[in-house]
Amino acid sequence: MFLKKVNDFITNDKFLSIFLFIVAILINQHYASRGIFPMDGFAHFDPGYRILNGEYPLRDYWVIHGIIVDYIQAAFFFLFGVSWKSYVFHASLFNGLLTVATYFIFRNFKLNKRYSLIYSFFFSVLAYTSSGTPFLDHHSAFFSLLGIYCLILAIDREKNLYWILLPIFFGLAFLSKQVPSSYVILSTFFVLFIYVVIKKKFDCLKYILISSAIFIIIILIFGNIQGISLDSFLVQIIYFPQSIGSERFADYKLTFKG
């Protein structure tokens, strides 16, 4: 009887998710200290520290990528102090949350606990450990992944909460980095259009639009509080990166000559 209770406890989804969460954090904490990319590894350390000291991106210094990662890092520095460990913990916590979300996606599709545990563990090893430290590409890709998870759950479970969360995660992905989030967002809207037309589920659009509007309003209010003008946001986040991309595309030549 006792062994059965122990077995039931350690095979419970809640216990397994907590186990994966802790393991994912420890894995990233370990590998983040094994080495560092000089350029990328500290990409958000200085911006996070500057925000903590009252210097804000877009207003006080120029950026060409999203700013969400910098603000999140500033929050970690505020809560845990300015140190290497608190810097890495940002990425580790994100790794843990993503791993748990992945586990529940597997379980949602009725994959047995053993395989869900193994696949989620492999995910935790490969997800944020390739960088170890907070990085805009990873945040953008993984916020996009959470958005895709919400789309899957919204269609499968037909719960309005997931439609509400969908634009929020995509908004955070875009504000982390414009690419790859833009490609994921456009692809998702294409899938969503097909779903709405075929299934006649027009109600979901209401929740998506309301959530999107609230998210945009919050961002505008936050920017106003920070003294960031809309013009600076559009120039640095939208227009200038777009001009870089257009120049690269214009110079691209498709040839079979190598």
Residues covered by each model-derived region:
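Start-transfer (signal-anchor) and selected internal transmembrane alpha helices
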Residues: 1-27, 113, 206, 210-211
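Extracytoplasmic catalytic/substrate-binding loops of multi-pass membrane glycan-assembly enzymes
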Residues: 32-47, 57-72, 82-85, 226-230
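Juxtamembrane segments of multi-pass membrane glycosylation machinery
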Residues: 52-59, 72-90, 110, 126
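Transmembrane-helix signature of polytopic, membrane-embedded enzymes
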Residues: 97, 102-125, 160
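Membrane-interface transmembrane helices that cradle and orient dolichyl/undecaprenyl
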Residues: 108-113, 147-164, 173, 198
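Membrane-interface alpha helices of multi-pass inner-membrane proteins
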Residues: 124, 162-180, 184-189
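Short acidic/glycine- and proline-prone juxtamembrane loop motifs at membrane-interface regions
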Residues: 132-141
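Membrane-lumen/periplasm interface segments of specific transmembrane helices
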Residues: 205-250, 254, 258
